[in-house]
Amino acid sequence: MTDVRRVFFVSDRTGITAEALGHSLMTQFSVTTEQATIPFVDTAERARAALRRITAASAEDDHPPIVFSTIIDPEVLAVLRESEHIVLFDFFDTFIAPLERELEVPSNHVIGRSHGIADDSTYDVRIDAMNFALHHDDGATHQHYGRADVILVGVSRSGKTPASLYLALQFGVYAANYPLTDDDLIATRLPRALVSHRAKLFGLTIDPDRLHQIRSERRPNSRYAELRQCEYEVARAEAMFRREGIPYLDITTMSIEEISSTVIHQHALTRRV
């Protein structure tokens, strides 16, 4: 027997939607969970296989497994509905029917539309923004900063790269990022590469203790990871942000999604997708 509650995200496509919604709901409860995603459950046979996997994994548990579903096909979903061994939460059943009544229009019941290539132009924007973020990651090149919607600035390991990539993929934002070096932190002026793009700058900072922990995992017992060095770099970076009037955000306890959404909001960026 176990106190851990098993949670499964079951979908007829990638499972991203079921996972995102289900995880958001579960974070509202102080319970220990073991989570798993079962994607591409698009036939009754696959649904039965998924059900066998779920019930087998939970056979010794005190409570039935919780299953979040975004399956569209009624026949496939029926396999899960008929089971007495799971607690099923179907997102589409919860929201689609009320929306159909409100909008007075039947839904299309199209599988995978939220994460498929429904619009070629949107897909192209995401790919172009991703390429831009990759080419302008970690100060690799400053050549096309003029195209950037935002340039994230901060010390090493302060979340710049994942935030840049998420902004590109999720919102189609052209995000570059610039790492503050020792020379940049010693100087009393803005780095030369950033001077003409001041309006696009957005700073990311982090608690020195957390930075020390992250860097120690990457380079243990190095000067780079020393707490004193982390404290110095964070203090100098924040002093630069204040001196130069650069808006900045403490990302210590924030997820990548929260960081990106906050940058969008505070910097008044226009999302392309």
From Swiss-Prot:
Signal peptide: none annotated. It comes from the Bacteria. Pfam families: Kinase-PPPase (PF03618). Keywords: Kinase, Nucleotide-binding, Serine/threonine-protein kinase, Transferase. ADP binds at residues 154-161. It catalyses: [pyruvate, water dikinase] + ADP = [pyruvate, water dikinase]-phosphate + AMP + H(+); [pyruvate, water dikinase]-phosphate + phosphate + H(+) = [pyruvate, water dikinase] + diphosphate. It is an enzyme of class 2 (transferase). Coiled coil: none annotated. InterPro entries: Kinase-pyrophosphorylase, PSRP. GO terms for molecular function: ADP binding; ATP binding; phosphotransferase activity, phosphate group as acceptor; protein serine/threonine kinase activity. Its EC number is 2.7.11.33, 2.7.4.28. Bifunctional serine/threonine kinase and phosphorylase involved in the regulation of the phosphoenolpyruvate synthase (PEPS) by catalyzing its phosphorylation/dephosphorylation. Belongs to the pyruvate, phosphate/water dikinase regulatory protein family. PSRP subfamily. This is Putative phosphoenolpyruvate synthase regulatory protein. It comes from Halorhodospira halophila (strain DSM 244 / SL1). The lineage of its organism: Bacteria, Pseudomonadati, Pseudomonadota, Gammaproteobacteria, Chromatiales.
